[in-house]
Amino acid sequence: MSVLIRGVRPYGEGERVDVLVDDGQIAQIGPDLAIPDTADVIDATGHVLLPGFVDLHTHLREPGREYAEDIETGSAAAALGGYTAVFAMANTNPVADSPVVTDHVWHRGQQVGLVDVHPVGAVTVGLAGAELTEMGMMNAGAAQVRMFSDDGVCVHDPLIMRRALEYATGLGVLIAQHAEEPRLTVGAFAHEGPMAARLGLAGWPRAAEESIVARDALLARDAGARVHICHASAAGTVEILKWAKDQGISITAEVTPHHLLLDDARLASYDGVNRVNPPLREASDAVALRQALADGIIDCVATDHAPHAEHEKCVEFAAARPGMLGLQTALSVVVQTMVAPGLLSWRDIARVMSENPACIARLPDQGRPLEVGEPANLTVVDPDATWTVTGADLASRSANTPFESMSLPATVTATLLRGKVTARDGKIRA
């Protein structure tokens, strides 16, 4: 079946046009297109058309913790949030450190069919940091794993990290680093600063992140490798990234929506929903991250969508599992922090939420231009809408959103994966 999107503005620019999607591709773009007899018509008058979003950093919890999330519920949240591809991190149970697990995740994603689910393979066996996994076998499997990370923990041994970068270069795959020097964060739950001191919480210094980013930039330089930095959170990290890029080092980085909007003032409530890794930092860090995203020092937005069940969050702060939901709120938070103040345009949103992450992960069919003949992986956005976040109403199996009861701008009105409508007007289209 073909789909006709009526009255939309590609990238939020120019006059309103109609976009006809047929056979999984953009077939026509122009004003007042004829409606095919079998077309599914989407009235998107005045809405913005963007390439489907790509999330380099999600936790779908399958296998092992399906009580918090699984690939079906996570895919639904992704589609409703405008995503057409997500990367599922390896810290599952069992760990995704072999083709048995990565191929299972891939096949489950294909079975659900709402987004392309790309499994991330572990860098080290069991995330233990001691022995490299068989990256080549995972890359050669059905999932064709193209990104590897021990996210949740840092590959802290510099020799192991150097070998991983060398190995990855030979395979043409990417290492994504959770930048945290573990010896600086023992027992830490909050950003090291006045707020943590006042609340009596052990502090997590910026240097724990910055030192690993600097080290891995140098290792990538010497190995001639690419390295990607997960969830940048500190102003100092921005300076290191800028220096590394100026040196010609092949380093990329992501920032989460929650680090763009929130800061450690939230911790005063001792609410476990605000515990996240890396921690919410000071307002000055959030300002630096926003500017870095606008300037291209930080390449993309990634959600670090991390569902946790109520019994894992509704506990004392130190006992709460770190992580926040992000897939359905990401666009709105980015609009509030970046578009509303004029730091990014809608075309820039396409760059940081679709084109750049697709390029980093080397996905040939995602993040493509809105042109005739291109794959119809598309997101339609109502830029003028507002909505109030209610965790219980989100598609995730968990409800641990830090944006509970917030009024946020912009809504996703439709998502198309290879021409198939996967989400429309807040509902999943199976």
From Swiss-Prot:
Record-level Gene Ontology MF annotations: allantoinase activity; dihydroorotase activity; zinc ion binding
Binding site for substrate: 59-61, 91, 277, 308, 322-323
CDD domains tied to this protein: DHOase_IIa
A GO BP entry: 'de novo' UMP biosynthetic process
Statement: the UniProt record of this protein carries the keyword Hydrolase: yes
Cofactor note: Binds 2 Zn(2+) ions per subunit.
The protein's Enzyme Commission number: 3.5.2.3
Catalytic activity: (S)-dihydroorotate + H2O = N-carbamoyl-L-aspartate + H(+)
Cofactors required: Zn(2+)
Family in the record: Belongs to the metallo-dependent hydrolases superfamily. DHOase family. Class I DHOase subfamily.
Protein name: Dihydroorotase
Taxonomic source organism: Mycobacterium bovis (strain ATCC BAA-935 / AF2122/97)
Source organism phylogeny: Bacteria, Bacillati, Actinomycetota, Actinomycetes, Mycobacteriales
